[in-house]
Each structure stands twice: as structure tokens, then as C-alpha cells.
Amino acid sequence: MEAQDSGGGTGECGAQDAAPGPSKAPGSAGHYELPWVEKYRPVKLNEIVGNEDTVSRLEVFAREGNVPNIIIAGPPGTGKTTSILCLARALLGPALKDAVLELNASNDRGIDVVRNKIKMFAQQKVTLPKGRHKIIILDEADSMTDGAQQALRRTMEIYSKTTRFALACNASDKIIEPIQSRCAVLRYTKLTDMQILARLLSVIEKEKVQYTDDGLEAIIFTAQGDMRQALNNLQSTYSGFGFINSENVFKVCDEPHPLLVKEMIQHCVSADIDEAYKILAHLWHLGYSPEDIIGNIFRVCKTFQMAEYLKLEFIKEIGYTHMKIAEGVNSLLQMAGLLARLCQKTMAPVAS
């Protein structure tokens, strides 16, 4: 895949001036370097990583040319906006710049935007290939106010002959039912570790980045299925240290180290509450939030080698504690109580 502008046809500067991968320490470069997230953003639908079934439906839309209004829902960093831009590029070709309006609904979320910007664009005359429509892209559409969404549904009907709407959102249930019923809803899931690894290796090869296997594992661990996060972490670590290993990655990402968390779980499996608590107290005094600690405990526990029945019991207790923390009971005592319950699960029941 070539290094190209990902600005998606909105005429961003620096479209083709992405510099080749730096062979020296990156901080010394005297020119502007595009973020790798933008530099390696796919420009065609077949370059998108993951969610093959959903992307294949978009390819059918691009081939047939008859696109419905669409909603793409899914977690951050899975390629929702990129997919819409690739679809628009495939449909409109050279007319992309004039025939696409891209709005981020997090900023442009009020009813005035629907009444002014969107309506004005929908009314504009644009010369397009036969059977093609103008496209209005609403990113993070679940941030739009209810009033704006109500106004949007009427606009979608009035201009249905000339304009198609493409909405990207994290939670489709925050889009009102009348809009959902006017759209084809496509769902994206988090990317697998192997999918992220394949793209990381591709970028590493192009940028001539030195790395270790444990460094890539650390990037994948911190990304949690988010390709944007993975590429940002890769570039940040390379910019800061010039070498990708797990120590450098966790210095940049700064979250509870999974090796420490793994050791803590091992002490719980051995019913050694004192040693487990020492590690917990250490993480706490390093300033990590309870949400960060409990999140990493869960992620490490999922892949930890232990009896299946015990893993299920551990995950149940971790989930229960996570719920309490989310409700605001996030003290060190709450976390210590979790360790005590985990240790208790591993101890043989005492005959009465």
C-alpha cells in the first residue's frame, strides 16, 4: 500500500509529500512528517484491514453505484470513517472534492448545522457521473443532539434524489429510530491481534523501524483492537526512543505493566495475598487509576494459564469489582478486597 494522503478528498495540504521512512533518529528531521495514521490510511476499500464481510458489502455498493444512506457503527480505530471515504472515492472519482461534505458531529452537533451547512450543500448543483449522488459524511453522529437528528431525518427525505448520507458512530442505539430505519446499518468489530500485527509489520518495513517481538506484543496489548491506537503508539515509541521494545512501549503508553499484573495474578492463584497486595500497592502508588489497573487485570487474566473453572471465577470477581469501580467506589480497599476474593477462590474448602 502506498503512502498517500488520507485526508479523504477534502483537499488537505501535504497530500503527496509524505516523506520516506526516516533512517536516522526521527526527532532530527527538518521537514514535516505526516502522522503514520494519516500516511498509511487506506485509500481503497480492498486495503482496509478486518471486518471483511462488511467491507465486501461496501464494495458491492461501489460497484453497483446505487448506495443507500448508511450507518457504520463500531469501536474507535476500526476503519469506519476510512471505509466511508474509500467508498466515496470509488463512487465519485475526480468529483470527490466538490461532491462530498465531511462534518464531525462532535463539533457540528446542533440543529443549526442541519438547517444551514447540510441543507445548503444538499441544494448545490454539482456535475456528477450518471447514477451518482453527493455524499454527506457525519462522523461521530451519535454525538448529535436529538433536535439535530430530528431535523436531519426530514432533510434526508427531501434531498434523497441528489444526496446520500453516511453516518459513522460508536453506538448505533444513540441514533434515533427514524434515522436508523432510513439507513442500511453496518457493524464493525474490534480488529484481531493478527490483523493489527500484519499492518504494523507492513508499516515497520516501509519506515525501517528496528523492533523486538516483545515490543510488537506490547503495542498490540495496549491497542486493544484499535488500529489508530496501535499506529500512534508505534510512531510515538519510535519518535521517542528510535527502537521498539516492550520497555519503551510501556514508557510511552504508561499503563500498568502486564508482567507485574501477571505476577500479581500468579500470587492470587497461589493464595499468597501478601505478595499480591505488595504489587497492587506498588501500582497504586505509581499513580495508576483503578480503571487502568482493573482493565489490565482482566486482559491479562483472559490469557493466563490456569484451570478453566478458576479462570471463570476470577473473571466473574474482576467484572463485579469493575462494576463497583465504575459506580465510584474506587478505593485501594476495593482493589485489595478483589485480591482477597481471588485468593479465596483458589484455596481448598475447609471441611467443617
Swiss-Prot record:
SMART domains xrefs: AAA (SM00382)
Residues with N-acetylmethionine modification: M1
Bias (Gly residues) ranges: 1-12
One of the Pfam families matching this protein, by short name: Rep_fac_C
Record carries keyword Phosphoprotein: yes
GO MF entries: ATP binding; ATP hydrolysis activity; DNA binding
Biased composition (Low complexity): 18-30
Domain of life: Eukaryota
Modified residues (N6-acetyllysine): K161, K302
Gene Ontology BP annotations: DNA repair; DNA-templated DNA replication; positive regulation of DNA-directed DNA polymerase activity
Ranges for region Disordered: 1-30
Sites where the protein binds ATP: G74, P75, P76, G77, T78, G79, K80, T81
Localisation per UniProt entry: Nucleus
Keyword Membrane: no
Residue positions, PTM Phosphoserine: S28
Keyword terms of this UniProt record: Acetylation, ATP-binding, DNA replication, Nucleotide-binding, Nucleus, Phosphoprotein
A GO CC term assigned to this protein in UniProt: Ctf18 RFC-like complex
Function: Subunit of the replication factor C (RFC) complex which acts during elongation of primed DNA templates by DNA polymerases delta and epsilon, and is necessary for ATP-dependent loading of proliferating cell nuclear antigen (PCNA) onto primed DNA. This subunit binds ATP.
Classification via NCBIfam families: PRK00440.1
PANTHER family registered for this protein in UniProt: REPLICATION FACTOR C / DNA POLYMERASE III GAMMA-TAU SUBUNIT (PTHR11669), REPLICATION FACTOR C SUBUNIT 2 (PTHR11669:SF5)
Family: Belongs to the activator 1 small subunits family.
The protein's assembly and partners: Subunit of the RFC complex, an heteropentameric complex consisting of a large subunit RFC1 and four small subunits RFC2, RFC3, RFC4 and RFC5; the RFC complex interacts with PCNA. Forms an heterotetrameric complex with RFC3, RFC4 and RFC5; this complex has ATPase activity but is not stimulated by PCNA. The heterotetramer of subunits RFC2, RFC3, RFC4 and RFC5 interacts with RAD17. RFC2 also interacts with PRKAR1A; the complex may be involved in cell survival. Interacts with DDX11.
Protein name (Swiss-Prot/TrEMBL): Replication factor C subunit 2
UniProt source species: Bos taurus (Bovine)
Gene: RFC2
